[in-house]
A protein has these predicted regions:
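Short glycine-rich phosphate-binding loop at a beta-alpha junction
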Residues: 75-80, 235-243, 438
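Conserved RNase H-like, two-metal-ion catalytic cores of nucleic-acid enzymes
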Residues: 9, 13-16, 21-41, 149-298, ...
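Conserved "right-hand" nucleotidyltransferase catalytic core of DNA-directed polymerases
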Residues: 141-213, 266, 271, 291, ...
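A polyanion-binding, active-site-adjacent surface
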Residues: 1-148
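Residue-level signal for well-ordered alpha-helical positions
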Residues: 90-91, 126-128, 252, 287, ...
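Phosphate- and divalent-cation-binding pockets in alpha/beta enzyme and binding domains
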Residues: 86-87, 247-251, 448
Length: 541
């Protein structure tokens, strides 16, 4: 165990734990000590020769480490290592920057633990600098007895109107603010059978309102008041991920039915008249080669802390009072993010791109999401049947190759041997097994290509397994002159392509939104700022 000291004291209340490769006097002083306190002991963390820290290694090393720092009077461990932080606190994730936790190791629960950043990571991901600054400030406040957990007291005033009269009054009060933020909590992410459970508004990062919509026993009256408010409000509304909130507001408040295109256009023209989207602002301000995170909670973390709810994917499982406060904090955080990044947007001369390209594109995207892609169910069924027939013919073609038949015998022999190794008395024979080659089995495909056929391994998966994807199969064609091998590989490529359509696209099409015109509609969720390159992406589907 190696260590570095920065003062002449013999007792230390605070210890920085960091990988031995990062245990540098100059770097630790520059990135931590100069910003916090010189009376900090820096201690190395052990990793094996493969630069990994398995649980058994951390367990053995932590016992020695904790005894050592405890004998020196250490009260707080500053852990600049995600693996050791999770081990010491039993946390599932290492993302709780800005919080003080108890050490979970028996006998050392009196020691506090906080997460920091290894300065070496800044070279690959400069955006981690904000986390390091946040961590340093937290520790400094803790030492000075001024530590306050993130997110505490960010709500200065809040109202949760419940009666129609109260809701109407609070909505009326919003008209005096030239700019407000808005956020909705819904029953799901798709349009079908969805609705707005609650809605919140805020006029700055500390004050706002939230109330029930569909969850209200008089939901139709609440929706009527909401629609009237949006029609009359002349200010600017800030959203985070505006396409979702606006899409749901139009769908719930302005469309009489899922095919009401007139209501769609009315809503689009209304909501996109004066608005901001902090997700797009963040994208323009932070886009870089290392990648960026556009989520509201990530970008407001130093303000609101970790206020996420595990049950938020199903709002019916969340206490309604808790949900309303959560909804409001989303609005407050939206304001915080706007105040944080909008000045930077202007300073970087990106206002023209933001207003004339990005925001205009959001209106088009929301229209696309609401209208959807129509599919003829009869033609979908026919296409599905044809694809399944074609896939079966490809599999029969593959099974007809003698090489595949020989490989199936190998699979049977192997299965028989493995079964008999587990049996003590009664033994099995190859006649007890009927194994067909499964081209969708990565393990079997690896065995066929690289062991039985002896083809070279060209690339590996992220998990270190020999790759067998369509692109790899295409490349393998250039590494054999055997005509049978080439025919088998070409057949496997076709099977891979058709299988993907049959197993991925067809089910998604069948699960689309069946509307009154007897057509199935696909409603995507498009991400304008979801990629480094700026291309449009989609999810669900």
């Amino acid at each position: 165990m190696k260590h570095i000291t920065f003062s002449e004291t013999e007792k230390f209340k605070y210890a920085l734990l960091i990988k031995e490769s990062a245990l540098s006097y100059k770097e630790i002083k520059t990135h931590y000590i100069d910003h916090i306190n010189k009376d900090i002991l820096a201690v190395s963390l052990k990793y094996n020769s493969e630069n990994k820290a398995p649980a058994i290694l951390m367990k053995e090393y932590s016992e020695e480490l904790l005894k050592g720092v405890d004998s020196l009077g250490v009260e707080l461990l500053i852990v600049a290592d995600s693996n050791y932080f999770k081990f010491l606190t039993k946390a599932k994730k290492a993302d709780s920057f800005g919080y003080i936790k108890d050490c979970a190791i028996k006998g050392f629960n009196h020691i506090k633990v906080t997460l920091s950043v290894n300065y070496q990571a800044l070279f690959h991901n400069p955006t981690l600098k904000d986390k390091l600054i946040l961590s340093n400030n937290l520790i400094k406040n803790y030492i000075n007895n001024t530590y306050v957990p993130l997110g505490i007291n960010i709500i200065h005033s809040s109202k949760y109107p419940n009666t129609i009269k109260e809701i109407k009054q609070e909505l009326s009060n919003l008209h005096k603010y030239p700019m407000i933020s808005c956020d909705v909590e819904t029953y799901g992410l798709n349009l079908e059978n969805n609705d707005i459970g609650t809605i919140a508004f805020a006029w700055d990062k500390h004050n706002g309102i939230a109330f029930k919509v569909k969850m209200h026993q008089l939901s139709n009256l609440v929706k009527k008041e909401l629609k009237e408010f949006f029609l009359k409000y002349t200010g600017t509304i800030i959203y985070h991920n505006a396409t979702f909130d606006i899409k749901m507001l139009i769908y719930v408040l302005f469309m009489d039915n899922p095919l009401d295109y007139k209501g769609t256009i009315t809503g689009l023209n209304l909501f996109y008249k004066r608005m901001h989207d902090t997700k797009i602002i963040i994208y323009l301000c932070t886009n870089n080669a290392a990648g960026n995170k556009l989520g509201l909670k990530h970008n407001s973390y130093e303000f609101a802390g970790d206020y996420s709810l595990k049950e938020i994917k199903d709002i019916t499982k969340v206490n309604q009072d808790t949900l309303l406060e959560y909804n409001l904090i989303d609005c407050l955080s939206t304001w915080y993010v706007f105040d944080k990044f909008y000045p930077k947007l202007i300073k970087e001369n990106q206002l023209n791109i933001y207003e004339n390209l990005m925001l205009n594109s959001l209106k088009i995207i929301t229209n696309m999401e609401l209208v959807g892609l129509p599919i003829n169910p009869d033609k979908l069924k026919k296409t599905s049947e044809e694809l399944h027939t074609f896939l079966n013919s490809l599999i029969r073609r593959l099974e007809a190759f003698n090489i595949i038949k020989d490989y199936e015998e190998v699979l049977v022999q192997k299965a028989c041997e493995e079964a008999n190794m587990k049996l003590k008395r009664k033994k099995k024979t190859i006649d007890d097994f009927n194994i067909k080659f499964n081209p969708n089995s990565g393990k079997q495909l690896q065995g066929l290509l690289y062991e039985f056929m002896g083809l070279p391994i060209l690339e590996y998966t992220d998990k270190g397994q020999p790759a067998t994807g369509a692109n790899t199969l295409k490349n393998l064609l250039n590494h054999t002159n055997n005509k049978n091998y080439q025919e088998i590989i070409n057949t496997l490529i076709e099977i891979t392509k058709v299988s993907k359509i049959v197993s991925t696209f067809i089910p998604a099409f069948n699960n689309g939104y069946l509307k009154q015109d007897n057509r199935i509609y696909l409603h995507g969720s498009f991400n304008l700022g979801g990629t480094v390159s700026g291309r449009l992406s989609s999810n669900s589907p």
